[in-house]
C-alpha cells in the first residue's frame, strides 16, 4: 500500500478534479445538490465514532470528519489498486463531515432505539444545545484541512404526547441528537443562531470556502440551463 500511496499522491494531471464524498448520508447529498454539486463518487465510511474520555464535542466532530476523509482515501486507493477505478491519474478532493449535538459537554448519541431517542428529546426539551459541524477536505497531494462550525438551537418544551408522536414517525433514526431539523422536528425549534445547513448536516458556506481553496470549480455548475 505504501508504494501505491506514494505513486497516487505524486501524480498530477490537468483533467477535471473529482469530488469524492466520504458519506452516504442523503441529507449531505441533498445539501450539496443545493449548491450545484454532484459528487463523482460516494463512499460510506465505517469508523468508530465513540468519543474519547473527556473529549470536547468540537474536538470529536473535527476528529471524526478527518478520520472519515482518511478512511475514504484508503478505500479510493484500494479500489484503484484492484482495478475498480480508472481515476489513478485524477486530481481529487475528498469531502467528509461530521455532526455532533451536545448540551454543554454532554454529547448526545445517534440513538439506536426509541428509548435512546426519547432520552435525547427529553434532555433537549426546553433547552438550548449546540450543534458542532466539522467539514474536512483532503486532496491527492495529501493536503488536509478541517473547518468547524457551531450553531445554537433552542427547543420548546416537549410534551409526552409530542415526543411519542415524533418517536412513532421514525424520523429520529440515524440522526445526531435524535432529531432532524429539516423535518417534523422543525416545529420544536424556537430559536436558532448560526448556520442552518450545519444543523441539517453540512455547513454550506464553509464547504464552499474549502472547495474554493482546493481549486474545485464549484461555480462552473452555477449556469442557467436553457430549454
Swiss-Prot record:
EC number per UniProt: 3.6.1.9
Cell inner membrane listed as a keyword: no
NCBIfam families listed in its UniProt record: maf
Subcellular location: Cytoplasm
Signal peptide: none
Single Gene Ontology BP annotation: nucleotide metabolic process
Active-site residues per Swiss-Prot or TrEMBL entry: 98 (proton acceptor)
Enzyme class (EC, first level): hydrolase
Cofactor(s) the protein needs: a divalent metal cation
InterPro entries: ITPase-like_fam, Maf-like
UniProt keyword annotation of Lipid metabolism present: no
One GO MF term: dTTP diphosphatase activity
Sequence similarity: Belongs to the Maf family. YhdE subfamily.
Site-annotated residues for Important for substrate specificity: 27, 99, 182
Protein name: dTTP/UTP pyrophosphatase
Catalysed reactions, as listed in the record: dTTP + H2O = dTMP + diphosphate + H(+); UTP + H2O = UMP + diphosphate + H(+)
Annotated SUPFAM superfamilies: ITPase-like
Keyword annotations from UniProtKB, A to Z: Cytoplasm, Hydrolase, Nucleotide metabolism
Pfam families: Maf
Organism: Bartonella quintana (strain Toulouse) (Rochalimaea quintana)
